[in-house]
C-alpha cells in the first residue's frame, strides 16, 4: 500500500495534508494521534470509501484505489472495522460474522453447523470464551467489547489482504484488547 501526497480537507480545515506512507505485506502499522487528527479519515481513504482531495493517490498492489463502496472494497480484499461498527442487532452472532459473505465451500453451501463452529473458532482466536453467549445468541445481548469482537471476527473470516481496524479495542477489556 502506497500513499502519495494524500490530503483531505473539510471546508478550510485539513484533516490530512501531504501524507506519504508505504505499508508492506505482513506489516502491522498503528496510527496514533489526538481526536480529530485524521486517523479515521485516512482509514476511509485507504479503503476507498472516501476520496482524497485532488492530487493525492493511493496504490494497492500496483492498482490505484478509487472511491467505491464497502462491499466493493471487501471484494478487493480490503476489510475495515470502524469504531462505530455496523452490526445487525436482532441477528445471531454467527449471522453477523457471515453477513455479506458467500457461504460456500468446495462442495457447495456451508452448513449452519459449520458456520457456528467457524464463528466459535474465530471468537476464541481473539480471546472470547464466554459461557454467557453462544454463536446463536443475538448481538443485542452482547456488551460493547463483545460486539467489537463480532466485527473483528467478520473482518478476519476470509483472511483479507488488508485489514484496517479503526479504534478496534475501545470497548474491550484489557485482556481482550491485548489478544486482538
Locate the predicted segments by residue.
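Glycine-rich phosphate-binding loops of nucleotide-dependent enzymes
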Residues: 1-180
Amino acid at each position: 500500500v502506497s500513499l502519495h501526497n494524500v490530503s483531505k480537507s473539510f471546508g478550510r480545515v485539513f484533516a490530512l495534508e501531504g501524507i506519504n506512507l508505504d505499508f508492506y505485506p505482513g506489516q502491522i502499522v498503528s496510527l496514533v494521534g489526538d481526536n480529530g487528527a485524521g486517523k479515521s479519515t485516512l482509514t476511509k481513504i485507504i479503503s476507498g470509501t472516501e476520496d482524497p482531495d485532488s492530487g493525492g493517490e493511493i496504490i494497492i498492489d500496483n492498482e490505484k484505489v478509487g472511491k467505491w463502496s464497502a462491499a466493493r472494497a471487501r471484494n478487493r480484499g480490503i476489510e475495515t472495522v470502524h469504531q462505530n461498527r455496523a452490526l445487525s442487532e436482532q441477528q445471531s452472532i454467527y449471522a453477523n460474522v457471515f453477513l455479506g459473505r458467500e457461504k460456500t465451500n468446495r462442495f457447495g453451501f456451508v452448513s449452519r453447523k459449520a458456520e457456528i463452529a467457524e464463528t466459535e473458532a474465530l471468537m476464541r482466536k481473539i480471546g472470547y470464551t464466554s459461557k454467557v453467549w453462544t454463536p446463536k445468541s443475538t448481538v443485542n445481548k452482547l456488551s460493547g467489547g463483545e460486539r467489537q469482537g463480532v466485527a473483528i471476527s467478520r473482518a478476519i473470516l476470509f483472511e483479507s489482504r488488508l485489514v484496517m481496524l479503526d479504534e478496534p479495542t475501545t470497548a474491550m477489556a484489557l485482556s481482550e484488547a491485548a489478544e486482538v
